[in-house]
């Protein structure tokens, strides 16, 4: 089966065989072989050869290809949404919003490129100072499985817009979405070699990251892999590395007037996408006392009624599955470990069907757990921590190596100002779900959540480097020479 796209040709992978399955039915929906190191090298060479001509195209010419890609996405929106839903397990309504985000990324990237890069000039003495930008060359994009269309798209689109050529290595759990996305680029008229698809798992990723022919790498995924890449690229200032990783995100709740609004926002923060967004709330900080008890009782009651089902189930569920049976097992094991260490199950997460990666929402009170693991449990498992006062809540919120997202539900603007000032996170929300962020806003975190902001508004900064010039059309001897220099 032809699973790789290199130099404008679909080719069969020669590496390890792997499959993609529907996480609920376990039906195989894609099969193929990954790219070997030799095939990775071929793709790098193809990208290197295609780069000069693509970079020399005018910005408007490149924009026209991107706009054709957006048109292709729109024409295949239903097909792509179904593909995303089938391969990830997320409900169709949510998969459709991902396709919309992919389309919207085109206009956002063009606007950001014009604002952040482009060309600027001004007089400087008898010359003109000019600032222009040039693409890096060949960049690799490593995509995640939770948003297999939208998140790699957030790197690929601005990279191509800036004039780079791209090597796309998607998650081995979502190869079908990647294949369909590349087909849309082909329909858009992207020249051969400008975008190359390298399917595969760990060995393919290692070969691509280690290839000396790449000029940079944009990664979205786990902190473990991201940390490995950071170590691998240490001492290589000639290569750009941008990492978007996970978080152990806190959502702090104060006593608010609208209890149900708080409950709904918590559910949207913790259980959207079956908890498989890097910005999902992992830790819910609730005040001690009667009001906090009432909030938790209401949260548990509502969460217990959340619809969980297959991606195409009708009426549509709120939550689909997690990505795989392996992921489901790991989450169930994590819950058991927390319970063994003293957590109290307010609402136990369950796996209704042993051979389906469907999990129901789980809520554990971990206040009594002496040493809570600082890790991202990537699924619908929310940990509750009771706090005594607001300073205690902020200290607990910051008690993590991560720093991606943090949120506050409060009726007090003064409290929010304090929270915003003292929180250590790249995204800080007030009375909005933790997973909410403007598509055009810089996205990323601090600490173990990553470095840089190589998507959305700041993407252009990482896809092109600035070149400062001092220019004048004529070479003229200055009227006054530097002391000590004589031309007579």
Curated annotation (Swiss-Prot):
GO terms for biological process: arginine catabolic process to glutamate; arginine catabolic process to succinate. NAD(+) binds at residues 221-226. Keywords: Arginine metabolism, NAD, Oxidoreductase. CDD domains: ALDH_SGSD_AstD. The keyword NAD applies. PROSITE patterns: ALDEHYDE_DEHYDR_CYS, ALDEHYDE_DEHYDR_GLU. It holds the Pfam family Aldedh. Its EC number is 1.2.1.71. The active site is at 244, 278. It catalyses: N-succinyl-L-glutamate 5-semialdehyde + NAD(+) + H2O = N-succinyl-L-glutamate + NADH + 2 H(+). It is an enzyme of class 1 (oxidoreductase). One of its GO terms (molecular function) is succinylglutamate-semialdehyde dehydrogenase activity. Pathway: Amino-acid degradation; L-arginine degradation via AST pathway; L-glutamate and succinate from L-arginine: step 4/5. It comes from the Bacteria. NCBIfam families: arg_catab_astD, PRK09457.1. Catalyzes the NAD-dependent reduction of succinylglutamate semialdehyde into succinylglutamate. Belongs to the aldehyde dehydrogenase family. AstD subfamily. This is N-succinylglutamate 5-semialdehyde dehydrogenase. It comes from Pseudomonas fluorescens (strain ATCC BAA-477 / NRRL B-23932 / Pf-5).
């Amino acid at each position: 089966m032809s699973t790789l796209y290199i130099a404008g040709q679909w080719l069969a992978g020669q590496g390890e065989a792997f499959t993609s399955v529907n996480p609920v039915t376990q039906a195989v929906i894609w099969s193929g072989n990954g790219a070997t190191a030799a095939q990775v090298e071929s793709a790098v060479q193809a990208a290197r050869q295609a780069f000069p001509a693509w970079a020399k195209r005018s910005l408007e010419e490149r924009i026209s290809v991107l706009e054709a890609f957006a048109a292709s996405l729109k024409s295949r929106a239903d097909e792509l949404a179904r593909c995303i839903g089938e391969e990830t397990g997320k409900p169709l309504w949510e998969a459709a919003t991902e396709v919309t985000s992919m389309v919207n990324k085109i206009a956002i990237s063009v606007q950001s490129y014009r604002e952040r890069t482009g060309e600027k000039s001004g007089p400087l003495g008898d010359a003109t100072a000019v600032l222009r930008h040039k693409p890096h060359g060949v960049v690799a994009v490593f995509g995640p499985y939770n948003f297999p269309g939208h998140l790699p798209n957030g790197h690929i689109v601005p990279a191509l817009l800036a004039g780079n050529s791209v090597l796309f290595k998607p998650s081995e759990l979502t190869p079908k979405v990647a294949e369909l996305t590349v087909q849309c680029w082909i329909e858009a008229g992207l020249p051969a070699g400008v975008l190359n698809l390298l399917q595969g798992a760990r060995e393919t990723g290692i070969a691509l990251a280690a290839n000396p022919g790449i000029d940079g790498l944009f990664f979205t995924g786990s902190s473990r892999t991201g940390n490995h890449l950071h170590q691998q690229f240490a001492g290589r200032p000639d290569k750009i590395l941008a990492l978007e990783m996970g978080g152990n995100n806190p959502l702090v709740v104060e006593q608010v007037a609208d209890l149900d609004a708080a409950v709904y926002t918590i559910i949207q923060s913790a259980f959207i996408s079956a908890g498989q967004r890097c910005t999902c709330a992992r830790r819910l900080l609730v005040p001690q006392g009667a009001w906090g008890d009432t909030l938790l009782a209401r949260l548990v009651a509502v969460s217990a009624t959340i619809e969980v089902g297959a991606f195409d189930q009708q009426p549509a569920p709120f939550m689909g599955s997690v990505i795989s049976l392996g992921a489901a097992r790991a989450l169930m094991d994590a819950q058991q470990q927390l319970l063994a260490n003293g957590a109290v199950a307010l609402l136990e997460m369950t796996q209704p069907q042993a051979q389906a990666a469907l999990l129901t929402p789980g809520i554990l009170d971990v206040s009594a757990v002496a040493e809570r693991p600082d890790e991202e449990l990537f699924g619908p498992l929310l940990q509750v921590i009771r706090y005594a006062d607001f300073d205690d809540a902020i200290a607990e919120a910051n008690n993590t190596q991560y720093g991606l997202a943090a949120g506050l539900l409060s009726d007090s603007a003064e409290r929010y100002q304090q929270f915003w000032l003292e929180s250590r996170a790249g995204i800080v929300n007030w009375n909005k779900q933790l997973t909410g962020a403007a598509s055009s806003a810089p996205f990323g975190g601090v600490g173990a959540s990553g470095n840089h902001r190589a998507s959305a508004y700041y993407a252009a900064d990482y896809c092109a480097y600035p070149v400062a010039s001092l220019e004048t059309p004529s070479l003229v001897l200055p009227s006054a020479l530097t002391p000590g220099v004589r031309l007579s």
